[in-house]
Structures are given as C-alpha cells and as structure tokens.
Amino acid sequence: MLSPEALTTAVDAAQQAIALADTLDVLARVKTEHLGDRSPLALARQALAVLPKEQRAEAGKRVNAARNAAQRSYDERLATLRAERDAAVLVAEGIDVTLPSTRVPAGARHPIIMLAEHVADTFIAMGWELAEGPEVETEQFNFDALNFPADHPARGEQDTFYIAPEDSRQLLRTHTSPVQIRTLLARELPVYIISIGRTFRTDELDATHTPIFHQVEGLAVDRGLSMAHLRGTLDAFARAEFGPSARTRIRPHFFPFTEPSAEVDVWFANKIGGAAWVEWGGCGMVHPNVLRATGIDPDLYSGFAFGMGLERTLQFRNGIPDMRDMVEGDVRFSLPFGVGA
C-alpha cells in the first residue's frame, strides 16, 4: 500500500469518485470512503509505523502528497457543489421585480410613543406648549437650580449616572425638570409648558423599574396661580388618560423644587376590569428658590409643576404585569395597542 503505484491508484480512485459526485450528500459519502479513517490513504498512513526508520521519512512524504492531492480535489468539488446549490436557491427564491408590488406590512408603533403623543396632544389642546432639553445635563440644571441641597441623596452615584471626568459636572438627567429651568431662563412670562422625554437612573431592570424611562412634566408660571389651578389641570389630565370617570387626590409629600409638595393618586377603571386608587406622580407649587434661580420675583409670580412616568402610567392603566415587556422590542407586545400589521 505504500508503493508509489498503490498510492497513485488510491488517489486516482478518490479523484474519480469525487468528480462523479453530483450532490453534497454523495460527496460526503465519497469523502468517508476515500478520505475517512478506514480509507486506503488512511491505512497507508497507519502502515508507516511498521517501516524501518530509514524508510519512514520518504514514505511519509509520498503518503502526505497523495492525501493532499485527494483532499484538494475534494475541497474544489465541495466549493463547486455549494455554489451550484446556492445558485439554485437564488433562482428558486428569486423575485420578479416587474410584477406588481404587494402590501408591505407596517410595523407596530410602540405604546410608549403613542402615549407620549396623546399626552402632548392633550396639553396642546389646552393651550400649553411643548418644550425640550438635552438628555446630557449639568448638575447646575439638574440639581442646583432646582433647590437640591448639596448633600441630597439623589446626587449620589447610587442614583445618578455621572459622566467622566468627574469635574465636568455632567450627568444623564434624572428627571425632565431641568427643562423647567431652561425654559424659564429663555422665555417671557407667563409660561405653560409640557416636557416629555427620556430620563436615567441607576435602577435595576425588573417588573416595576427600568434604568431608562420616559417622564412627562408640566410647568405653569403666571400671576395668581394656586393649588386650585394645579388640581384642575391634574383632573383634566387624568380624564384624558384614564377616562371621564377618573378622579385625582393629593397627599402631602416633600420635593426640593416645590412648596407645598404633594403626591398625586388617580382613581380609574383599568383595562382588566378593576378600579382603585393608584399612586401616579408628584406635584406642587414651584419653590420660591427655583423662581429666584431663574430671575423671577416670587412675590409677583407663582407657579405649579407636576411629573409622571409614562411607563408607570401605561403599566397600571393597561394592566401590564411586567415593565420589562416595554423595553424588549417584541412586536407582539406593541400590536394590541393600535397601529400595526
């Protein structure tokens, strides 16, 4: 088996069988027969062990050359058959571009975007304006101008994403409240604005929290505004989002940027048949220090503000048990909410 004639015969047989293989399955069987562990070429390699040491090197070169020749033939035939298979698939799955087009299914709009647009439409209809601000903020706008003390827990890295280097005093905004400051510095009074956007906090993603969430925040600054105006605005907002039977109530609370401050609860009949009071967000009269930080005399003007999370609003309004469904991008979650294929 180690003679040049025997090796040539084995290679010729392998190459002939390889050339005749007309499918990948047939070629696989040919490989097993002529290049596998029990093939003539494999047996020739095993026979090297019994040769005298002085003959083994030369014989080994002949065996390797023979196997390499057969392997090259196999590789070339494999590439050819794969190319033929792929070409056949392209022909079978080809599209005649001259045919009339078919309807392309529309994607599903994300329910958070739909809710944000509905909130915006609600306040625009009330005569309010939309305002925007950057997602990368400074401590000045995110904390200082909003009356946060220097030692407030919200400033800690366990709650806030800070941006390197440390002395840049930049961070990912933790709420949309910085838009209030930017708006009051840039616009003439009175101001009635609504701000909707992404905010960032170092929360773990779980059934009720997400590190990136959307917040809607309202701000009104004018002469003579009171808690009564705030309550009326909240009631109108609640009815727009939860139906005409929705009601709100407020409970005393503390926020650095409002005084007095309150938390807002909403009562409504949800989409799964229940009705209850649910904590919705925060609100209050704009703190005099916030007005002073933007050059407004708190003896002449007053204001109110409120903020709610859109994910939380959508979750309890629609009976969604797990907030993670909102961020996983599964179209099956979005389709039931409206526009989609």
UniProtKB/Swiss-Prot annotation:
The chemistry this enzyme catalyses reads: tRNA(Phe) + L-phenylalanine + ATP = L-phenylalanyl-tRNA(Phe) + AMP + diphosphate + H(+)
**Per the UniProt record, which EC number(s) apply here?**
6.1.1.20
Q: Name one GO molecular function term.
A: ATP binding
Q: What is its main location?
A: cytoplasm
Name the enzyme's class.
ligase
Which Pfam families does the protein's record reference? Phe_tRNA-synt_N, tRNA-synt_2d
Annotated keywords:
Aminoacyl-tRNA synthetase, ATP-binding, Cytoplasm, Ligase, Magnesium, Metal-binding, Nucleotide-binding, Protein biosynthesis
Gene Ontology BP term (one): phenylalanyl-tRNA aminoacylation
Stored SUPFAM superfamilies: Class II aaRS and biotin synthetases, tRNA-binding arm
Write down how the cofactor binds this protein: Binds 2 magnesium ions per tetramer.
Q: Per UniProt, where does Mg(2+) bind?
A: E259
Q: Which residues cross the membrane?
A: none
User: What are its cofactors?
Assistant: Mg(2+)
Q: Give a Gene Ontology cellular component term annotated to this protein.
A: cytoplasm
InterPro entries assigned: aa-tRNA-synth_II, aa-tRNA-synth_II/BPL/LPL, Phe-tRNA-synth_IIc_asu, Phe-tRNA_ligase_II_N, Phe_tRNA_ligase_alpha1_bac, Phenylalanyl-tRNA_Synthase, tRNA-bd_arm
Keyword presence, Coiled coil: no
For this protein, the record's PROSITE patterns field holds: AA_TRNA_LIGASE_II
> Where does the source fall among the domains of life?
Bacteria
Subcellular compartments:
Cytoplasm
Quaternary structure? Tetramer of two alpha and two beta subunits.
Instruction: Report the family membership.
Output: Belongs to the class-II aminoacyl-tRNA synthetase family. Phe-tRNA synthetase alpha subunit type 1 subfamily.
Q: What is this protein called?
A: Phenylalanine--tRNA ligase alpha subunit
- Taxonomic lineage of the native organism: Bacteria, Bacillati, Actinomycetota, Actinomycetes, Mycobacteriales
Name of the encoding gene: pheS
